[in-house]
């Protein structure tokens, strides 16, 4: 998931310098040993959640890997990943996603390390029964810093909606937070289960069609305001819990699958292939992604004409 675990009992391999093509990225990005994030999170005071029901918090405190075992080095270069044949003629653009739990970030170092884009958590709906909407405390700081550093920026919202009305409310919450900002990447709807607890979404027992409708309600509300919208989900959710194929006919799909060679066969615009990358300028583990495109998505200004069509 987004900003996945900081304690992970899988093989960690440091990157050999020659593993990354110098023309692509620097050697500042590599897989870290498990102690890396533990110590740095303690130093940054990040071992407390934003709120008690922040659905992402548990990912940093449990040994959990919901999307498959990562047995590779989480590098940016193509040496680490096997890309599907359908992407053989497509440019690969590498980036990260971050939330409060990445701590204080030196965005200049991030940019210099070879990162080209960042997806920032706007906020989340609490996974408790109240379902309170909460802004990520570092959202605006991250957005300003990443923008000034020259990174392409998108955002995501971690849902715990159980009705389409709540999904639309989440979209309006996001639109209010990003008002006045320029985004070059989509607004993503992060739909997944809460790790090591039962969130309100799972407790609701919604059908596949109902959970898919949540995604549609959120994305369509975002699109009506002139932004691009997409869906983030892991391999299991896209295949079994929501209609990944159907959603892919309308929106960009951001797949989370922690492996060096995903076999997901539906639309996949971006692949989050590890939650344990380390990036210069960030002290905690960071999710790493590859965007399959000859160029990054249209700027928001290019999408405004769609609004009234």
Language-model features: where?
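Short, small-residue-biased leader/transition segments that mark boundaries at the very start
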Residues: 1-6
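Sec-dependent signal peptide cleavage junction
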Residues: 8-22
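Functionally critical loop-and-helix segments that line ligand-binding/catalytic clefts
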Residues: 20-102, 108, 247-309
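Intrinsic-disorder/low-complexity, polar/charged segments
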Residues: 40, 163-164, 234
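A generic short-segment signal for beta-strand/edge and adjacent turn/coil regions
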Residues: 62-67, 85-89, 157-159, 222-226, ...
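Substrate-binding cleft of extracellular glycoside hydrolase catalytic domains
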Residues: 88-219, 223-225
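Surface-exposed substrate-engagement region within the catalytic domains
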Residues: 177-187, 191-308
